A protein has these predicted regions:
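Residue-level marker for well-ordered alpha-helical positions
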Residues: 12-13, 227, 237, 290
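Local cysteine-cluster metal-coordination motifs and their immediate loop/turn environment
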Residues: 82-87, 143-156, 231-252, 293-309
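Alpha-helical scaffold segments in carbohydrate-active enzymes
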Residues: 114, 235-238, 325
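Iron-sulfur-associated redox domains of electron-transfer enzymes in respiratory
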Residues: 1-226
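Generic structural signal for well-ordered, non-membrane alpha-helical segments
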Residues: 4-11, 236, 299, 312
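Alpha-helix boundary/capping residues
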Residues: 93-96, 233, 322
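Ferredoxin-type iron-sulfur electron-transfer modules in oxidoreductases and energy-metabolism complexes
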Residues: 207-231, 248-354
């Protein structure tokens, strides 16, 4: 691959160069808000200050892909995001919800993240960056990363157009992952050279750690367990609204048949003798998990958004991962790989039909 090494302090000039040289028309980039982190959409390069202190911050609020969902205009936007966010953006391209030619995906390494409120409350202890050793030490003090991050096996910046890899101590390796990425780096004023970025051993370690954490998660493995798991759900649909790959223009559960009220509710009770309320609680989640079964990137935004603190990571990512394994599909890995449900083969999945 082609790339270069920059000091952390040089990253500000790099991001400003993307705007100044018209590589992108706007940039979605993290910013510091008090002790926490949020995103901003930048048009004026002078609004970017000290990005090195925040782009690797182990904090997760909203999935950046959700910000650019529906970006189907000619103006080009760059996104500085974690791997799960980039992967969600790639799935949106496949779903025709994001124009591939109008987005530049800049992915940063991620060791794992804390819910934004946890990060802000413990910023003094967590700081601007973490590694696996620090995460383990903080967990011993009761400050734990999100379950979605603990079971994630795609933490390195190896998807998207440009990688910002923390692979060399005080330096950041800035490398193009696609021809578009190479062209963007050159246009931004960087001089590229051949870079060897072998992270196989690191990926193996991450995969082993993620599997161990996944195996340790409490299981929702029966109808009774699922009913108990979803007992407190108020069907607010927050999990749908923050999901980067849930995009239906008209949701069934916003329609009268999917969200009955008044007389319709009474008629259902009359027909069945009794109904659980809120209605369609189980059907809502089963429908959603089917809809995102191949495109879920396990970012955990659904769990973060739940007002009842239901640990949805134990449901959505766990179930969708099983479907993805059946199809041998990794969402967001390759923008050219077709979505499993959009392809057909005469002989496929025979082992699942036996």
């Amino acid at each position: 691959m082609k790339g270069t090494e920059l000091s952390y302090g040089d990253l500000e000039g790099f991001f400003k160069g993307l705007l100044e040289n018209n590589v992108v028309d706007a940039l979605v980039i993290p910013r510091r808000v008090g002790a926490g982190v949020s995103y901003m959409l930048v048009r004026d390069k002078d609004k970017i200050t000290s990005p090195e202190s925040v782009i690797f911050a182990p904090s997760f609020g909203v999935n950046a892909a959700n910000i650019v969902k529906g970006w189907l205009i000619d103006e080009k936007v760059g996104i500085v995001a974690k791997p799960c966010e980039t992967r969600a953006a790639i799935e949106l391209v496949k779903l025709k919800q994001l124009d591939e030619e109008s987005v530049l995906l800049i992915t940063v390494d991620c060791a794992g993240a804390y819910a934004n409120e946890v990060y802000a409350a413990n910023y003094a202890a967590i700081g601007d960056q973490v590694d696996s050793a620090k995460i383990k030490d903080l967990a011993g003090k009761g400050i734990s990363i999100r379950d979605a991050c603990a079971i994630c096996d795609n933490r390195l910046a190896d998807v998207g157009d440009i990688a910002l890899a923390q692979a060399n101590g005080s330096k950041v390796v800035v490398a193009g992952l696609t021809e578009k990425g190479d062209a963007a780096l050159t246009a931004a004023g960087l001089t590229l050279e051949d870079k060897e970025l072998d992270r196989a051993a690191e990926n193996q370690k991450i995969a082993a750690e993620a599997k161990a954490n996944l195996d340790a998660l409490p299981k929702v493995d029966s109808e009774a367990a699922l009913e108990e798991f979803l007992r407190d759900c108020i069907v607010c649909k927050n999990c749908r609204d923050v999901c980067p790959v849930c995009y239906c223009k008209e949701c069934f559960f916003d329609q009268p048949i999917g969200n009955p009220t008044g007389g319709d509710l009474l008629n259902l009770a009359e027909a069945r003798g009794a109904i659980a309320v809120p209605t369609n609680q189980l059907m809502y989640h089963l429908t959603r998990v089917y809809h995102v079964s191949t495109t879920c990137v396990a970012c955990g935004a659904c769990e973060d958004a739940c007002p009842k603190d239901i640990p949805l990571t134990r449901f959505y990512p766990v179930l969708t991962r099983k479907v993805q394994e059946i199809f041998e599909y990794v969402p967001g890995k390759d923008v050219k790989e077709p979505l499993p449900f959009t392809t057909y083969e005469d002989e496929e999945l025979e082992e699942c039909l036996r």
